[in-house]
């Protein structure tokens, strides 16, 4: 299930390392994560109050992330005036570990904007 969250283009060594790190969680951790994200951590009604003039918001989603799809991200961004969205091609749910070089192509421009 978790391996499907990683883009197939990710380097094999990074893919393996990402899966190894995730597998270190005990039984039930992933199920608990999903419950939190969908029930306890459901902030859909609160996102409208985010003031992007006070705190810019950049939403980056990997195209292979089925746990937080591009559609989910776009729907959330539509509720937050000023939110910036980037769908990251050839990346999944763990972009920083599954393909660090590809992730840099997306995160560095965001960091440059923030630094201005």
Give names to the regions the model predicted.
Residues 69-78:
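Short alpha-helix in the alpha/beta-hydrolase fold that links the catalytic acid
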Residues 52-54, 80:
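Short, well-ordered coil/turn elements that cap or connect secondary structure elements
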Residues 53, 59-61:
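Short beta-strand/loop motif that positions the catalytic acidic residue
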Residues 1-51:
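Conserved alpha/beta-hydrolase catalytic His-Asp/Glu region
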Residues 17, 32-36, 74-75, 102-109:
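Alpha-helical elements of Rossmann-like donor-binding domains used by nucleotide-donor carbohydrate transfer enzymes
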Residues 27, 70, 97-100:
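Conserved loop-to-helix N-cap of the C-terminal "lid" that shapes the substrate pocket in Rossmann-like
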Residues 63-68:
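Acidic catalytic loop of the alpha/beta-hydrolase fold
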Residues 81-116:
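Catalytic active-site module of serine/aspartate enzymes centered on a nucleophile-bearing elbow/loop
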């Amino acid at each position: 299930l978790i391996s499907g969250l990683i883009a197939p283009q990710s380097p094999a060594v990074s893919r393996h390392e990402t899966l190894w790190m995730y597998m270190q969680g005990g039984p039930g951790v992933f199920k608990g994560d999903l419950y939190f994200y969908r029930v306890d951590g459901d902030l859909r009604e609160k996102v409208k109050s985010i003031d992007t003039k006070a705190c810019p918001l950049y939403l980056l989603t990997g195209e292979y992330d089925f746990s937080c799809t591009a559609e989910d991200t776009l729907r959330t961004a539509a509720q937050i005036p000023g939110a910036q969205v980037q769908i990251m091609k050839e990346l999944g749910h763990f972009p920083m570990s599954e393909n660090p070089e590809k992730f840099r192509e997306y995160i560095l421009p965001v960091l440059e904007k923030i630094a201005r």
